[in-house]
């Protein structure tokens, strides 16, 4: 009885992070007795306030694979500079042969992005963005390229300090 109460209390608490399952892959290994099935999961987590991370997990059970991936993602969080509901400037993210072009969009445009890029943008908290995936369509590499692009964003404050200008001169 005590354990069930603890579980209910834990489930009723508001979650700190939004978890998005991007890819679940069932793989099988042939052994002497037949085929052994295992699962691989790719998960993106974010707080919708500018922090995001991704993780991969492998296990013999789907739920364990997702749990492992979520824990790994929470350990690999990065902070992204978000201006209002979009990104401050255009950026290109690369990982291996996957390239992702991210462009800021005016308010009300929405997230114009494909599967993996959309999940990352939702987890970060970006509401308006335009994107184009170029090169490889591999899901894992696309997620890594998207995060590379988001990591390379300049903050308005840092840009104004580097150029020796005020914030109003740069962003208008």
Regions found by a protein language model. Name each.
Residues 1-172:
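Ribosome-associated RNA-binding proteins
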């Amino acid at each position: 009885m005590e354990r069930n109460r603890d579980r209910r209390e834990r489930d009723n608490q508001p979650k700190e992070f939004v978890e998005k399952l991007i890819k679940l892959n069932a793989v099988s290994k042939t052994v002497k007795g037949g085929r052994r099935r295992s699962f691989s999961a790719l998960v993106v987590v974010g707080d919708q306030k500018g922090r995001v991370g991704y993780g991969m997990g492998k296990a013999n059970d789907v739920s364990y694979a997702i749990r492992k991936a979520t824990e790994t993602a929470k350990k690999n969080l990065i902070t992204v500079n978000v201006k209002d509901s979009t990104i401050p400037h255009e950026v290109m993210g690369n990982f291996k042969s996957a390239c992702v072009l991210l462009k800021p969009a005016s308010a009300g445009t929405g997230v114009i992005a494909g599967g993996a890029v959309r999940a990352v943008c939702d987890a970060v908290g970006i509401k308006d963005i335009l994107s184009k995936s170029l090169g490889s369509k591999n899901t894992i590499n696309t997620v890594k390229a998207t995060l590379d692009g988001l990591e390379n964003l300049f903050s308005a404050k840092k840009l104004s300090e580097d150029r020796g200008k005020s914030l109003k001169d740069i962003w208008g």
